[in-house]
């Protein structure tokens, strides 16, 4: 069973994302309320997927994603955030984030995204978007 780590400062969001990951076939092996322990958790668990919020206490998720991918380029990261500024999205794309899922998201769509991101590593491409979609009804901005 593929494994996942959830990093989000909201306990409610961690619970919701955890349930969606389980529906997508993942086992949640660790959770954190900020990105400060991300490197340590990744090294300990080597998950198949990481979900990461951007706006959290301490380091922001975009910076943490860039740091993790610089050290572990094989890490698969999905950003789950309500922040849809083009500069943060571009930082995440340059860092190699696989997908940028905007909150609030449709649960069925999120499950689909988690499954597709895992399959993406098996050469099934995600769709490409030219513009950042509004955060409603299950929008995601995959890596180009």
Across the structure, where does each feature detected by a protein language model lie?
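Two-component/phosphorelay signaling modules centered on CheY-like receiver
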Residues: 11-30
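Acidic catalytic/metal-coordinating carboxylates
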Residues: 34, 60-64
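Active-site beta3 strand of CheY-like receiver
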Residues: 45-51
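Receiver (REC) domain active-site loop signature in two-component systems and cognate sites
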Residues: 56
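Alpha4 helix (beta4-alpha4-beta5 surface) of REC/receiver domains from two-component response regulators
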Residues: 63, 84-101, 112
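C-terminal output helix
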Residues: 87, 105-118, 122
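CheY-like receiver
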Residues: 112, 119-144
């Amino acid at each position: 069973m593929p494994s996942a780590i959830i990093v989000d400062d909201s306990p409610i969001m961690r619970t919701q994302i955890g349930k969606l990951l389980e529906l997508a076939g993942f086992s949640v092996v660790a959770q954190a309320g900020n990105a400060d322990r991300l490197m340590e958790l990744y090294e300990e668990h080597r998950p198949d997927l990481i979900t990461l919020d951007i706006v959290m206490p301490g380091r922001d998720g975009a910076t943490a994603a860039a740091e993790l991918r610089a050290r572990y380029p094989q890490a698969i990261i999905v950003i789950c955030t309500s922040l849809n500024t083009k500069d943060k999205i571009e930082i995440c794309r340059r860092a190699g984030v696989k997908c940028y899922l905007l909150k609030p998201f449709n649960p069925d769509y999120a499950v689909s995204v988690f499954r597709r991101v895992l399959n993406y590593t098996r050469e099934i491409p995600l769709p490409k978007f030219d513009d950042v979609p509004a955060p409603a009804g299950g929008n995601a901005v995959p890596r180009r």
